[in-house]
Amino acid sequence: YIFLSISLLLLFYIFYKAQIVHGGLESVYYLKYYYFSFSLIILSLFSFKLSKEIKFMISTVIIASTFSLYIAEIVLLKINNYEDTAIKKFALKKNPNFDLRSQYEAYMDFKRIDENYVNPVLPKHFIYDYNVKLYPLSGIPNKPVVSCNENGYFATYNNDRFGFNNPDNQWDIKTIDYVLLGDSATHGDCVNEPDTIGGKLRSYNNVNSLLNLAQAGNDQLIEYATLKEYMPTGKIKNVLILYHENNDLPGLSLSLKHPILKKYFDDENFSQKLKNKVTELKKIKEESMSKRTERGKKQQDDLDWIKANKKIYERRKLITLIRNTIVFTRIRTELIEGNRFEKAEEDVFKEFEEILMKYKKFLKAKDINFYFVYLPDIRRYIDNEKK
């Protein structure tokens, strides 16, 4: 009965995380955990038919394995807490004026200056929403955006008429020198627009026009869909894809599972005609932003409560630590999720090559130069130094 009770508690906890904490926004992500908990329930029911000797052996193995896992979990939690504290101390030492506001606090402060400010709405926010009628490939158009903080300040930029990080007049130029596609590094996450890759390239005298169609979290399929939906009508000289080896392929694995995005892969003529559906898209994007802002408010309310109730918080912190330890938070992050990314790379490499060939065919037919820029991850060199 103990095994069955634990299995049921696990199921309820997964439901709580998926539907209450995340508001159902990431239900697809939690499917594997639902399958796991149901499997445990079935096994626990089956165990009632086993003999006492076999039950004892199984229980011994489970208890020993669980004990070992908890030791590993505690060690990983200690290491993670140390790293977080060290990073914060280093940031403050390098920049005493490092902005320590939360994303929600910064957003609300910017809203007091200009009520038009919005939070980022990104294509990846819809990757687990299989019921969305239109799949957005950009942010909320014609709005100033409060970006993230990695350098001690909250970066801002203005979305153009289609929701991309560009000066809006770039769309009116008849001949486009460069179109950029990529993820956060190309999008310009956490830096102001003049400091983005697109902003730097525009500063060169020989670059007359450039459109940055990148969005944080994008992968090759989303980028391919973006190019097909938002291809400028005038002449384009060059298209550059900036590929980041650390996370683009795992992202592609998720995109290939989405029913709308998969159509771009299967059908070269498929289009959502997003340029003509600005009103419908705006509603979908604003609803998504509203949900995420509400989640940010809840997190901020929790932080404010912590500041006002430090003694009670210390008890709650202990409870949270125990809860995270019970569900193997760090082990899942370090091992299960890490292996998922490695497996994803193997599973989708063929599709990745096919998408590149689709790019080549699509752009060659329009007499556009195609460049693939490979951005290596820093861990490649750190790992080599360790070896």
Language-model regions, residue ranges each:
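Membrane/wall-proximal cationic-aromatic binding patches
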Residues: 81-204, 332-335
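Membrane-embedded alpha-helical segments of integral membrane proteins
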Residues: 2-47
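Extended hydrophobic/aromatic segments used for targeting, binding, or gating
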Residues: 64, 202-203, 211-216, 221, ...
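Conserved SGNH/GDSL esterase-like catalytic core that processes O-acyl groups on lipids
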Residues: 178, 187-270
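Internal/C-terminal transmembrane anchor helices
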Residues: 52-78
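Membrane-interfacial loop-to-transmembrane alpha-helix junctions, especially the N-terminal start
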Residues: 1-7, 54-59
